[in-house]
UniProtKB/Swiss-Prot annotation:
It comes from Prochlorococcus marinus (strain MIT 9313). This is Ribosomal RNA large subunit methyltransferase H. Its main location: cytoplasm. InterPro entries: Alpha/beta_knot_MTases, RlmH-like, tRNA_m1G_MTases_N. Belongs to the RNA methyltransferase RlmH family. One of its GO terms (molecular function) is rRNA (pseudouridine-N3-)-methyltransferase activity.
Length: 144
């Protein structure tokens, strides 16, 4: 896997300090990671804002409880398949993402069968992106 070239588009702001600290730590380790925040609004307006934030060269990957659950190693392999394409992972707000947005993509990702607060989902995703990069590059962070 190439060095990180991912984007996270997330609805809402991170308010918890410990999550902000965790995000800052992983962003230092993933210098190519971009996080874009979209304002909380009605679901159709959020979907509009998410689409407006997307670049034409990005592949949209919504996070959803209906999405595909992968092990960390499987996630790393999946990311490798996308090669140089830039992936834009999307995390919805308290009400999730619109069905139209989720259904317009080729791949949805689930971080857990459980429902997670969107702030925590953001931190978990960033950690898994870092883990995937170290798995692919043979780093010592991931221990099987």
């Amino acid at each position: 896997m190439r060095n990180c070239a991912f984007r996270i588009i997330a609805v809402g702001k991170v308010r918890k300090g410990w999550i902000q600290d965790g995000l800052a730590m992983y962003q230092k380790r993933l210098p190519g990671l971009i996080i874009t925040e979209v304002r909380d609004a009605s679901m159709p307006r959020e979907a509009e804002a998410i689409r407006a934030a997307l670049n034409s060269n990005e592949v949209l990957v919504p996070l959803s409880e209906e999405g595909e659950a992968l092990t960390s190693v499987s996630f790393a392999k999946r990311l490798e398949k996308y090669g140089s394409q830039r992936l834009a992972f999307v995390i919805g707000g308290a009400d999730g993402l619109s069905a139209e947005l989720k259904n317009s993509t080729q791949w949805q990702l689930s971080l857990s069968a459980m429902t997670l607060p969107h702030e925590l989902a953001r931190l978990l995703l960033v950690e898994q992106l870092y883990r995937a990069q170290t798995i692919t590059q043979g780093g010592k962070y991931h221990r099987s």
